Amino acid sequence: MEYRKIKDEDDHDVASDIESVKGKSHTVASSNIAMATLGVGSSERINWKRKGVVTCALTILTSSQAILIVWSKRAGKYEYSVTTANFLVGTLKCALSLLALTRIWKNEGVTDDNRLSTTFDEVKVFPIPAALYLFKNLLQYYIFAYVDAPGYQILKNLNIISTGVLYRIILKRKLSEIQWAGFILLCCGCTTAQLNSNSDRVLQTSLPGWTMAIVMALLSGFAGVYTEAIIKKRPSRNINVQNFWLYVFGMAFNAVAIVIQDFDAVANKGFFHGYSFITLLMILNHALSGIAVSMVMKYADNIVKVYSTSVAMLLTAVVSVFLFNFHLSLAFFLGSTVVSVSVYLHSAGKLR
């Protein structure tokens, strides 16, 4: 009996120890889950903050871009060569990317993800968007033979639809029905906001004009979506390395554009003929805008970029009221309202 009593006490102690260990295990497991959840939440907050910062930066830079372009003109004309300005934009973007990489190498050292040297398989895809943008920019000069400037701004909104369609086809990303409705409303809102007394001429645009507008929209949409695919193919790759290779080929194709369009003018008048302080500010703005675009593609997507640039268009019009005595029409307020509804629908579609 004494033996059984002692044995029962031992069994009870062992059971208590087992329960204690189980309790500790559950506590540790719960703690690990809580830590993991906290880590994921913190990471998501950082990503949202990063997306918000680069999107706001792109919106502000894009809205000021049009104002600087207007200021850079004299008597309604560019006294400087647009192609040389584009070349300098690419050069500055390369320099800024290298500067950022230099700081990273100094602070973190050289790793596989931030190493500038790369393989041919990784680099060979970067010339494609540069070539697409070159052809698109060349078409931009010829389309004005068939449509005026206000009409061109309206036809440019075809980029919105082409980006959405190519985003679905190339990246295999689905947009919800609500998001598609928001996207179509965005195109309608931007078009409505740009309507004026001369807008009826758009319907009178000839077949070559419409063809060029559609081709330009497809080139722009494809280049943007393809660039996003390149940048996101290797998520861990440092964005500054990817930017550098994108901009190097962009510089090369801009050099080709100088030879094709402005070789005689540059040879006779000089590379920097007609440049002013405003021109230099415009070049800096374009360079920073380009970097902001690539960061939006890296941390967000082309859809966010389209919304950002569309909101920037409206912001430019509002600022122009104070700078250029620009008068906002009823169509602008109606279009702005439609764009706001579109932004809400896109956000609501994501939440679902």
UniProtKB/Swiss-Prot annotation:
Topology class, membrane: Multi-pass membrane protein
Single GO MF annotation: pyrimidine nucleotide-sugar transmembrane transporter activity
Residue stretches spanning the membrane: 52-72, 82-102, 125-145, 175-195, 211-231, 239-259, 277-297, 314-334
Regions of this protein lying in the Cytoplasmic compartment: 1-51, 103-124, 196-210, 260-276, 335-352
Subcellular location, record wording: Golgi apparatus membrane
GO cellular component, one term: endosome
Lumenal side: 73-81, 146-174, 232-238, 298-313
Chief subcellular location: Golgi
Keywords (A to Z) from UniProt: Golgi apparatus, Membrane, Sugar transport, Transmembrane, Transmembrane helix, Transport
Role of this protein: Sugar transporter involved in the transport of CMP-sialic acid from the cytoplasm into the Golgi. Essential protein.
Stated family: Belongs to the nucleotide-sugar transporter family. CMP-Sialate:CMP antiporter (TC 2.A.7.12) subfamily.
PANTHER family per UniProt: NUCLEOTIDE-SUGAR TRANSMEMBRANE TRANSPORTER
Designated name of the protein: CMP-sialic acid transporter 4
Organism: Arabidopsis thaliana (Mouse-ear cress)
Top-level taxonomy: Eukaryota, Viridiplantae, Streptophyta, Embryophyta, Tracheophyta
